[in-house]
Amino acid sequence: MKIGVASTLTVYAITAGVFFLIDLFWLGVLAKGFYAKHLGHLLREQVNWPAAVAFYLVYIAGIQVFVVGPALQGGWGVGHTALWGGLLGFFAYCTFDLTALALIKSWPLPVVFVDIAWGTVITAATAAAVIILSRTLIKALGAV
């Protein structure tokens, strides 16, 4: 499926919305106590929103460039898309967590495992959901 610039921007917006909502639920509800327990001494009282927004914009662009775009262009199935999304999440979150473990004193090992698993799951789930939503929207509107 060939998509134009408007469709690419629409799919980016869908990716951003899906990823942000899932991550907000994870960080704000499900894992809030876990991170407070293990990283409480390092956590800010207020989120550094410019840094957070920069992360989301860059990471979502990565999902778009390396997974969702090729999936739409190549006609990948949902499972194939989720697999590649999971791999991207695994490698990206490994990069952060293993670097933190190597360089930051007392970086908690449980955080490494949970965070890498989370990166794998959220990126796989986001990629799969975005493919379903994007294809549905593109078909319904003919092109976005």
Which residues does each predicted region cover?
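Juxtamembrane/disordered regions of integral membrane proteins
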Residues: 2-118, 122-144
